[in-house]
Curated annotation (Swiss-Prot):
GO terms for molecular function: DNA binding. This is Probable transcriptional regulatory protein Bcer98_0465. InterPro entries: Integrase-like_N, TACO1_YebC-like_2nd/3rd_dom, TACO1_YebC_N, Transcrip_reg_TACO1-like, Transcrip_reg_TACO1-like_dom3, Transcrip_reg_TACO1_YeeN, YebC-like. One of its GO terms (biological process) is regulation of DNA-templated transcription. One of its GO terms (cellular component) is cytosol. It is found in: Cytoplasm. PANTHER family: TRANSLATIONAL ACTIVATOR OF CYTOCHROME C OXIDASE 1. Keywords: Cytoplasm, DNA-binding, Transcription, Transcription regulation. Belongs to the TACO1 family. YeeN subfamily. It comes from Bacillus cytotoxicus (strain DSM 22905 / CIP 110041 / 391-98 / NVH 391-98). It comes from the Bacteria.
Length: 239
């Protein structure tokens, strides 16, 4: 298993403080999911996933409703989902997921962020094979043993269940994202601290202080791009 989820989350805290950027990214993602399928999350699994993730970031209902209404209204605005892969300092690996209405602009922006910050773009597949698509669900108020028992009784599989700080974090296959939550809800859980579909590195690397400083600049440059939705990497940033 890769880095503990709470360590990843802690390092994102300063970024997450920029709520307007977070909300804008979710608004775009909700719009795309609603436009590609039904605007009802009960009949649109992709939309349901995004809404469950948005809840853990406290995205306001007004932003969610506006994005869904925009999709219902037949907006002609179209977005492509594109993934870029690349390398940072000392062979560190990075995956960048984007939603874009201008592929050429996004490709140029992502390439520039890599090139200006000690990295370089790779070809498709050059990095992703070192990561596993993973559902990550977090909750408070139960022990890992209690969660394991709940999931076993519901016949839901998990890769790993870990106690991290005050939370229990469940790592599962992506197709178990809803099943894990439904089993826990049936056992009384009403709120999740984490609900993510992510890419977890199979192995982490540690960088020197100088290389890590440059790496963090690269990650910041990528995350600051409007078209970038998610950035995944294999660097252990420490505490």
């Amino acid at each position: 298993m890769g880095r503990k989820w709470n360590n990843i989350k802690d390092k994102k805290a300063s970024k997450d403080a920029n709520t307007s950027r977070i909300y804008a990214k979710f608004g775009r993602e909700i719009y795309v999911a609603a436009k590609q399928g039904e605007p009802d999350p009960e009949s649109n699994q992709a939309l349901k996933v995004v809404l469950e993730r948005a809840k853990t970031y406290s995205v306001p209902k007004s932003i969610i409703d506006r994005a869904i209404e925009k999709a219902k209204g037949g907006s002609e605005e179209n977005y492509d989902e594109l993934r870029y892969e690349g390398f940072g300092p000392n062979g560190s690996m990075i995956i960048v997921d984007t939603l874009t209405n201008n592929v050429n602009r996004t490709a140029a922006d992502v390439r520039a962020a890599f090139n200006k910050n000690g990295g370089n773009m790779g070809v498709n597949g050059s990095v992703a094979y070192m990561f596993d698509a993973t559902a990550v669900i977090g909750l408070e108020g139960k022990t890992a043993d209690e969660v394991l028992e709940i999931l076993m009784e519901a016949d839901v599989d998990a890769r790993d269940i870990l106690e991290e700080e005050d939370s229990v974090i469940i790592y599962a296959e992506p197709d178990q994202f809803h099943a894990v939550q439904e089993a826990l809800k049936a056992a009384g859980t009403t709120e999740f601290t984490v609900a993510e579909l992510t890419m977890l590195a199979q192995n982490d690397v540690e960088l020197s202080e100088e290389a890590q400083a440059q790496f963090e600049k690269l990650i910041d440059a990528l995350e600051d791009l409007d078209d970038v939705q998610q950035v995944y990497h294999n660097v252990d940033l420490g505490e």
